[in-house]
Amino acid sequence: DFLKKNNLNNNNILSIFIPNSYNVYWDTSPEDFRDKMLNEFNKFWDKDRSEKAKELGLSKFEVISLASIVQIESRKIDERPRVAGLYLNRLRDNMRLQADPTVIYTIKEYYKNFDTIIRRVLYRDLKLDSKFNTYKIKGLPPGPITMPDISAIDAVLNFEKHNYLFMVANPSNKGYHLFASDLSGHNRNKRAYIRWINSKGIYR
């Protein structure tokens, strides 16, 4: 069995598909394509990347799960190492990740509609039961919530060292976040964000 032989399961199988350019013949069988992707995955995880994952105390699959959250959290490539560092700080401190992208994934999974656009996470959403909802579970979800690109994976492996534990979208710098190392600082940032999102009439 391919999954068992390669320590894969239905939750983490997407991890072996590293977004990149590949040469594939039009008549390649699904099995040959799958095997090629696994081979490319193993090549991607060279000595340098493998050692960095080991230093983090994470498996390759866990790195990719975290990278998938980082990618959805920040579309800004230059901010991703900072976001990755924040999540790694929370894991180190045994805190729940409380990552909104996992809640959005949970909502879409719950309603079986992955095409819906969710611009605002509501408090009731945080209570949805799912092994992917990092407000409910401790640690990482059992697999990626998207196929992270190479920049997101490398952002985790080359994370920024800092003391941040909290973040919220920055209303005055679109696409970026405001970071805080304590709850009081985060609450100030959060109040500013809530005022902004309410002023835009965004309620879902």
Regions found by a protein language model. Give the residues of each.
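Bacterial extracytoplasmic/cell-wall-associated proteins, especially those involved in peptidoglycan
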Residues: 2-204
